[in-house]
């Protein structure tokens, strides 16, 4: 099991906002992941969660970028299942690169909860279903919120928030 050894934890994200972008493709896998991501946000005491739907994985990065402008953390959810053509590889490379670019350019963490699996069964096994071995929706949400808190702490320590100098009082 690839999830062996992963930490089970939540964070106190009270006051943080979370943007979630989820695909419509492979709904039987994505919907439970979305439910679990929202449950994680609630347990972490997120102040506000916005959910946006897109067609597929290639559309995720541009919407994640827009969410990053108004949220403390973003989560991307979807499932790309390998087919008989190289399209799978192009899609996976495209959205993965896009999500990394969004996080680096906006300085807002993006939790990657987009499954890239050879089979639907592999995706179901990671979707947080009652019989799943893993819970990638939950994990992606907590990871994004945790990273947002780490960034906030680092920025506060040097007198900055959101990458901008904070005003000093005299």
UniProtKB/Swiss-Prot annotation:
Record-listed 5-amino-6-(D-ribitylamino)uracil binding positions: 25, 57-59, 79-81, 112
Function statement: Catalyzes the formation of 6,7-dimethyl-8-ribityllumazine by condensation of 5-amino-6-(D-ribitylamino)uracil with 3,4-dihydroxy-2-butanone 4-phosphate. This is the penultimate step in the biosynthesis of riboflavin.
Metabolic or biological pathway, per its Swiss-Prot or TrEMBL entry: Cofactor biosynthesis; riboflavin biosynthesis; riboflavin from 2-hydroxy-3-oxobutyl phosphate and 5-amino-6-(D-ribitylamino)uracil: step 1/2
Active site per UniProt: 87
UniProt xrefs under HAMAP family: Lumazine_synth (MF_00178)
Residue ranges of coiled coil: none
GO annotation (BP), single: riboflavin biosynthetic process
Keyword field contains Ribosomal protein: no
Highest taxon of source: Bacteria
Keywords: Riboflavin biosynthesis, Transferase
Residues annotated for (2S)-2-hydroxy-3-oxobutyl phosphate binding in this entry: 84-85, 126
NCBIfam families hit by this protein: lumazine-synth
Molecular function via GO: 6,7-dimethyl-8-ribityllumazine synthase activity
Pfam families: DMRL_synthase
One Gene Ontology cellular component annotation held by this UniProt entry: riboflavin synthase complex
Root EC class: transferase
Protein name, per record: 6,7-dimethyl-8-ribityllumazine synthase
Known catalytic reactions: (2S)-2-hydroxy-3-oxobutyl phosphate + 5-amino-6-(D-ribitylamino)uracil = 6,7-dimethyl-8-(1-D-ribityl)lumazine + phosphate + 2 H2O + H(+)
Organism classification: Bacteria, Bacillati, Actinomycetota, Actinomycetes, Streptosporangiales
UniProt similarity note: Belongs to the DMRL synthase family.
EC number: 2.5.1.78
């Amino acid at each position: 099991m690839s999830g062996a050894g992963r930490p089970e934890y939540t964070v106190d994200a009270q006051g943080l906002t979370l943007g979630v972008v989820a695909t419509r493709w492979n709904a039987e896998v994505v919907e439970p992941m979305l439910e679990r991501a929202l449950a994680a946000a609630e347990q972490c005491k997120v102040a506000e969660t916005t959910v946006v739907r897109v067609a597929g994985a290639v559309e995720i990065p541009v919407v994640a970028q827009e969410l990053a402008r108004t949220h403390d953390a973003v989560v991307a959810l979807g499932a790309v299942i390998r087919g008989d053509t190289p399209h799978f590889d192009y899609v996976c490379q495209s959205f993965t690169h896009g999500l990394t670019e969004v996080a680096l350019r906006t300085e807002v963490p993006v939790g990657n909860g987009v499954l890239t699996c050879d089979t639907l069964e592999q995706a179901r096994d990671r979707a947080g279903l009652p019989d799943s071995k893993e819970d990638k929706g939950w994990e992606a949400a907590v990871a994004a919120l945790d990273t947002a808190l780490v960034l906030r702490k680092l920025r506060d320590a040097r007198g900055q928030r959101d990458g901008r100098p904070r005003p000093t009082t005299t």
